[in-house]
Structure formats: structure tokens, C-alpha cells
Amino acid sequence: MTAQTMQIGNRPCRIYGEAHAEYLLLQMTGEHELQSMDGEVAAIAQSAHHFLFAAIPVENWNDALSPWEAPAVWRKQGFGGKAADTLRFLTEQVVPSLKQQFDLPEKVKIILGGYSLAGLFALWASTQTNLFYGVAAASPSVWFPGWMEFEQQRPIQTPYIYLSLGDKEEHTKNTVMAAVGDSIHTLHSRLAERGTDCTLEWNSGGHFKDADLRTAKAFRWVMEEHT
């Protein structure tokens, strides 16, 4: 599937797929992910569903995708808490631009997904709006300080939720990140109790293994779950 670049706001977004698509897949991406994007989209395309996929770049990963400020937990960079600005850009610029440019149905099914902190952003965004049909959260950073308490007070509104984690991810020496296993179990149980259509899949390996294929699997599950 060939990519094209579309300028939205001041950002060069990488677009794959076709006009009139049933699904619109959105993923916030860092520079470190762009080289594997072709492979990820090829894996998503193993689904029979018609989709348009947009990779939307973020300048500062830790700032743009974090819902509130938090101190550094790994290396030295903390979190700037600018997710609300990122979500506003998605809802006010990206989605309307793509709908118009690619003649998408008014009620196109929008799936927000991503890996790591982008997965957490997708989950957080679904507590703020009911715009999204589904969330594809691969190895999401649910260890993020205050997230689990926040979600309990302001629950996710999205009907289809895919969660995954590498089976070695919780065995880190970083005490904050080591909570990821317990947190994702708790979140999955909460969602199931509320009647959300959700799954939790365990992948082999640590956090940095097969990020592109894990994310592709997440998007595919959400598209195929209702069929």
C-alpha cells in the first residue's frame, strides 16, 4: 500500500488507504516509528475491511501524548501534559480534513491507536470524547502516574478496546514501569465489568519488540471484532 503525504496544520501526515473507507485509523507517531510504518500498514491490510490510515507526527513525544505533567521515570525527560492540545488538533483539524479530502462517510468508524505512550494517549482521549469507535492500545503506558485513578473517576467511553502487553514488560527494574502488568489487568477487568467489548493479549518479549506488528494487530482486532 503506497503512502502519500498530506499537510494538515503544519504537520506532514502520512496517509495510506482509500477514499470512501468504512474505517479511519489514526495513530500519533514519533520519528522512531516512521521507518516501520509501511510494514505496519501492510500488516493491517491483511484485514478484509476498507480503511484509511493516517500517521500523525508529534514533535515531542513525552509532552504531546501525556495527559498531565509528571516527572521523568526513565532517562531525564519528564512529561509536559499537552495531550489536550493534541486531541484538539485531531478533532478540529485532522478528522475534518481527512473526511473532506477522502470523501469519508459522515459516520466513518474512527479508531485511535498507538504504541506505548501513544497507546495511553488513545485511552485517555476516549475518556474525553465519544468520537472514537474503538481504541487500539498496544503496550500502552498504563503505568503513567495517576492514570488508573483518573480512569476510575472518568471512565473510557469507547465501545471497542484492544489492550496488549509484552510478557516481559512488567519485569523491569524501573519501579514505576513495573506496575504496568497489574495496571493493565485491572483496566481490562474494569472495562469488562462495564460491558465494554475488550480484549487483553499478551505478546512474547519486552517493550521494544515488534512494536509495528503489535500495533497492526491492535487495529485489526478492532476492525474485525464486530464481524
Where are these predicted regions, by residue range?
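The feature captures the conserved acid-bearing segment of alpha/beta-hydrolase catalytic domains
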Residues: 142-222
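Gly/Ala-rich beta-loop-alpha elbow adjacent to hydrolase catalytic centers
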Residues: 113-118, 122
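Serine-hydrolase catalytic machinery in alpha/beta-hydrolase-like enzymes
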Residues: 9-12, 21-103
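Short beta-strand immediately N-terminal to the catalytic nucleophile in serine-hydrolase-like folds
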Residues: 109-114, 138
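The conserved beta1-alpha1 loop
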Residues: 26-30, 139, 165
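N-terminal cap/lid segment of alpha/beta-hydrolase-fold proteins
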Residues: 1-18
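Conserved hydrolase catalytic core segment
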Residues: 124-134
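A conserved amphipathic alpha-helix that caps or lines the catalytic cleft of carbohydrate-
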Residues: 41-42, 125-126, 188
